Design a protein with these regions (language model features):
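A Zn2+-metalloprotease active-site environment signal
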Residues: 3-259
């Protein structure tokens, strides 16, 4: 599946900032941003928020530097700032078992305390946050929601074309066709592209903010060690394997540093 622009017209097709990869956006960004704000509030109610104000302030400080670097970059480039409608917010979730961080559409960011064992320092934290913010800058959530819409339409067309055979198979096997296609062959390769794109953009954002992006390689080495024996085969994963990720990042570091 391509980006789907030919099927839905140029108004639904745009490009990712910096990489200029074509992407499909059928869902209004403002709609996802509003939904993200609501969900973020629910997360804050449900999860235990850390009382470590020092670390939270560090996260906010790093985030602020990345925010400003992104805005300044696009201003210098005479390009629209993709974060102009973001309402940035940061939380630190107390959960040592979860080694994760994320950024919702619109700049709603969370870091789990378990991730701090992987990041180790400011450079590492900036690398992780730069990556997560890159997902939001590249509008990956909008893109994935749009492709989900496209996939649902395609499945309905397939069901009509097969006179209900697809639905009959689903009822017999209990298998969700959309779910299966989302896991293998259609959605995952695209998701891996998004992850690699966020790796690349994240390096740029962290570097522009004054951080040593060489720490990114060490992060993924530590993550690989933490996930030893647990990491799924890349084909069935939405993320590139740690080894491939390290190789890609290593090859990009000099290029990004020189920009």
């Amino acid at each position: 599946m391509g980006c789907g622009c030919a099927s839905f017209g140029l108004h639904a097709c745009t490009s990712v900032p910096i990489t200029e990869r074509k992407q499909l956006r059928l869902i209004p960004e403002a709609k996802l941003n509003a939904q993200a704000e609501q969900l973020y509030e629910k997360v804050k109610e449900k999860e235990k928020l850390s009382k470590d104000i020092t670390t939270l302030n560090k996260i906010k400080n790093i985030g602020s530097k990345i925010e400003n670097s992104i805005t300044e970059y696009f201003a210098r480039s005479n390009q629209p700032d993709p974060t102009v409608n973001f309402r940035w917010e940061y939380i630190l979730i107390e959960n040592k078992k979860v080694k994760n961080a994320w950024c919702m559409p619109g700049g709603k960011i969370a870091v789990y305390t378990g991730m701090l064992d992987i990041t180790k320092n400011d450079n590492g934290l900036a690398a992780v946050m730069g990556h997560e913010i890159a997902h939001a800058v590249a509008k990956h959530s909008v893109e994935r929601a749009s492709r989900g819409t496209l996939l649902n339409v395609g499945t309905k067309i397939l069901d009509i074309a097969t006179k209900g055979a697809v639905s009959n198979v689903n009822r017999t096997t209990g298998m969700d066709t959309v779910g299966l296609l989302s896991q293998i062959g259609i959605m995952n390769p695209f998701n891996r592209k998004q992850e690699s794109e966020a790796d690349y953009l994240g390096l740029i954002f962290a570097s522009l903010s004054g951080y040593d992006i060489r720490e990114t390689v060490k992060i993924w080495e530590r993550m690989r060690e933490a996930n030893k024996g647990k990491e799924p085969a890349e084909f069935m994963s939405t993320h590139p394997s740690s080894t491939n990720r390290i190789n890609n990042i290593t090859s990009w570091i000099n290029e990004v540093t020189l920009e």
